[in-house]
Amino acid sequence: MKLAHLGRQALMGVMAVALVAGMSVKSFADEGLLNKVKERGTLLVGLEGTYPPFSFQGDDGKLTGFEVEFAQQLAKHLGVEASLKPTKWDGMLASLDSKRIDVVINQVTISDERKKKYDFSTPYTISGIQALVKKGNEGTIKTADDLKGKKVGVGLGTNYEEWLRQNVQGVDVRTYDDDPTKYQDLRVGRIDAILVDRLAALDLVKKTNDTLAVTGEAFSRQESGVALRKGNEDLLKAVNDAIAEMQKDGTLQALSEKWFGADVTK
């Protein structure tokens, strides 16, 4: 009898431990990144800060641009503030991996390869890869084949570099870890063309007093989304819900019209 009683006690003890363990696991799972962001009161956003019109320093020295304002509005919809973390592109995803930032908002193109490692929000801009040349050389590049034999500048580790290496043979690929140097090399003739976001290209032509020019049609369709570490479904859902709200209430279109003079969100 005593043995039976002890057996029942042992069984009840095991069940109690299992129940507590189960509750602990559930509680830990519920403590996701979204909760941490809300407890902190800030969303840590990685962006370049040297990539007009998306993110750059204004005359007052403060960061401004389409993606700066988008990040601020996104954070507002989450009930927090955006803490902007300027980072060079070639180290930005590493910063995301190491949890120094929560998200990347930097015209990150959604691709099958990137989706293997990162989660992406629904797209918030639609664009394409555009060739930009020195003013007067517009006729030199009309199609991707015209890039053959030319010195073409691209951001190091960007989808522009990936696309160029995969789709054009016989091109002299020059990589850059910052945009100003790339633009300067194009102006002085060290390279023949650069590949950039179509939206950035149109803005850049205006800001450089027409010393540069867009040439040919955009080479491919690009959808950009907010990049997150995998496994943070709570924050991903909140970001997607916020983007949907911004599309519905007109916030996203208003930002697009302000910075590009057109709706580039669809």
From Swiss-Prot:
Subcellular location: Periplasm
Alphabetic keyword roster: Amino-acid transport, Periplasm, Signal, Transport
Reported induction: Transcription is controlled by CysB. Expression is highly induced by H(2)O(2). Induced by sulfate. Also slightly induced by exogenous L-cysteine.
Cleavable signal peptide: 1-29
A GO BP entry: diaminopimelate transport
GO cellular component: ATP-binding cassette (ABC) transporter complex, substrate-binding subunit-containing; outer membrane-bounded periplasmic space
PROSITE patterns on file: SBP_BACTERIAL_3 (PS01039)
InterPro entries, alphabetized: Iontro_rcpt_C, SBP_3_CS, Solute-binding_3/MltF_N
Function: Part of the ABC transporter complex TcyJLN involved in L-cystine import. This high affinity cystine transporter is involved in resistance to oxidative stress by forming a L-cysteine/L-cystine shuttle system with the EamA transporter, which exports L-cysteine as reducing equivalents to the periplasm to prevent the cells from oxidative stress. Exported L-cysteine can reduce the periplasmic hydrogen peroxide to water, and then generated L-cystine is imported back into the cytoplasm via the TcyJLN complex. Functions at low cystine concentrations.
Name of the molecule in the record: L-cystine-binding protein TcyJ
Annotated source species: Escherichia coli (strain K12)
